[in-house]
């Protein structure tokens, strides 16, 4: 089992999910830790990455710039969908780490567009 230590200092990671045919799709996402070794990200229910994660939760994460340029090694991980209190914990961690983006703008955009926000935990494989 690996650790998520290489992405701990990154605010954004490149999340690589996989299509049905196995081809990779990379997307930059904001990431936050809860103070321990738990990493979180969020998306909305109609996003293609959410659909791919429902089929295959195996992912690769690598530290990156906001635009998705990889700045470090990729780590194999598993994305676990969170619900209830765990999802609220993830939302708070993201809001603390990314004050404007994840505390205001993303939740507002999801509400305006009537999306359901999904919170995921990244666990190293």
Residue ranges of predicted features:
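Generic structural signal for short, solvent-exposed loop/turn connectors between secondary structure elements
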Residues: 1-2, 84-85, 125
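Short, structured beta-strand-loop surface elements
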Residues: 46-119
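Covalent nucleotidyltransferase core used to form phosphodiester bonds in nucleic acids
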Residues: 4, 39-43, 47-52
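Extreme N-terminal tail/first-helix region
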Residues: 1-14, 69, 104
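Short, well-ordered beta-strand micro-motif
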Residues: 121-123
């Amino acid at each position: 089992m690996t650790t998520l230590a290489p992405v701990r200092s990154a605010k954004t990671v490149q999340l690589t999910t996989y299509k049905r045919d196995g081809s990779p799709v990379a997307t930059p996402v904001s990431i936050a830790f809860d103070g321990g070794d738990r990493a979180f990200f969020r998306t909305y229910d109609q996003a293609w990455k959410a659909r791919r994660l429902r089929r295959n939760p195996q992912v690769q994460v690598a530290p990156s710039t906001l635009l998705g340029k990889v700045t470090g090694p990729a780590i194999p991980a598993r994305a676990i969908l969170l619900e209830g209190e765990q999802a609220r914990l993830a939302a708070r961690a993201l809001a603390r780490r990314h004050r404007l983006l994840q505390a205001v703008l993303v939740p507002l955009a999801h509400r305006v567009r009537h999306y359901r926000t999904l919170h995921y935990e990244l666990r190293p494989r």
